[in-house]
Amino acid sequence: YEAKFEEKLLEAKKMGATTVIYGDIDIELHRQWDIDRATNAGLDYELPLWQGDREKVVHEFIDAGFKAVIKKVNLENMSEDFLGKTLDKPLIEEIKKTGSDACGENGEYHTFVVDGPLFSTPIELDVLGKTISNGYGILDVK
């Protein structure tokens, strides 16, 4: 995974990218992984959310107009029923009721951002189904 990630960073660098922006908040192991990948690819890096309040971060993301769809859930924490749902404040409350972190920072869930103020057009996801694999529920999309 690391090699493939760095390969994609090198491709982005060839296209003119100079900096990698990461969304990690406060897990040092993740921060170091981010730094290592960027450094190995010869790119600068920024972690603008680093040391932010997790719940505040996710609320600011939603308030800013970003739309993210839950793409993967850890079935130890959350049910596959969360797959395909768009992150909003009521859903954050549902997520917290499962005992999961509001941001999913501990790997409870992962999202795919499909729209927001930086997008010229939203990304349309064609949902093909759901897969259960190795303790995770995964939304299959095209």
Each predicted region: which residue ranges?
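Nucleotide-activated chemistry modules centered on ATP-dependent adenylation/adenylyltransferase
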Residues: 1-142
